[in-house]
């Protein structure tokens, strides 16, 4: 599969905890939090790319997530689709791929603040 030059797709997941609170999937890199970012492969849709990334890299059971929203964000002047999913804590493994963590809503707001998001996702 050929990678399209510098085209990416972003994603996050809202995790519904058993106590009723929520956490969000983020990538922690160099003391910075960001969305999960996947390179777009030729012949695959943005949705297929992010689902494959979440499954293979982040170790999410993608059969147990629901698509909530699709919006657009800009990362370094690049137009990047942002997929937002949700899932229940009981449906996911505790351990995520390297660098991926579940963060509190306040931290997610700070992640959103670092991007130019068209139509802030509703969650």
Give a label for each model feature.
Residues 37-69:
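The catalytic Nudix box helix
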Residues 5, 55, 84-87:
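Short, structured secondary-structure boundary patches
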